[in-house]
Amino acid sequence: MTALQRFDLSAIAPTPWKNGGGDTRELACWPPGAGMDAFEWRVSVATIAAPGPFSAFRGVERQIMLLDGAGVRLRALDEGIDHALDERWRPVAFAGDQAIDCIPLGGASTDFNLMLRQGRWQGAVQVLQTACVPGSTPAGLCMVLSGRWQWGSEVMQAGEGLWWSNAAPPGAHAALQPLGGGADTPAVAWVALVPGFQLNRPLAQ
C-alpha cells in the first residue's frame, strides 16, 4: 500500500527526446521507476516543438490531451488517420503500436499523456470542474489545470497534483474541491484507473 504522492510539474526536470523534437516530464508510473518496457501505467506531460513520428509502444493503449499551444496534427495516412488535436482539454485515444506522425500546427504545444499496458489497467483521461476524491480508485492521478483547489489543509494550483496506487480503503481520503474567487474557471485532469483490459479503437479522423 502506498500513500498519496504529491507532485509539482514545475519541479520535475524535463527529459529531452532523442530526436530533439520535444521533451517529457513524467508525473507518475507504476511500478515506480519502471522503464518504458516494464510500466503498467504511466502519466506524463510532453512539450512538442518539432514534427516527427511518435514512438511505437506495442501492447500499450494511449490517450493524449492538449494543455497549451496551437496543438498538433496526428497523421497515419496508411491507416486512414488525420486528426487535428487543436482543442484544449479534449482527450483522444489510440493504440500505441500505430505508426503516427506528429506535426505542430503552430509553435510548441504541451500535452497530457496516459499510457496503459494492455491487460493490466483500464481508465480514461477526464477534465473535472467539481469535487473529486484522490485515492478513491485502485490507482490514478489528478493534476490541477486551472483555478485553485483545496485538499485538506492544502491549496493546489495549476501543475500541482497527486497520484496513488492502492493508497487506502475508499473513504479514507479528503476530497479535492474547487475554490471560488479566482479569475480562472477551476479545472482538474482526472485519471481513475482500475485493473482490467482496455483496447482503444483506432484514432478517429
What are these model-derived regions, one by one?
Residues M1-Q205:
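Jelly-roll (double-stranded beta-helix
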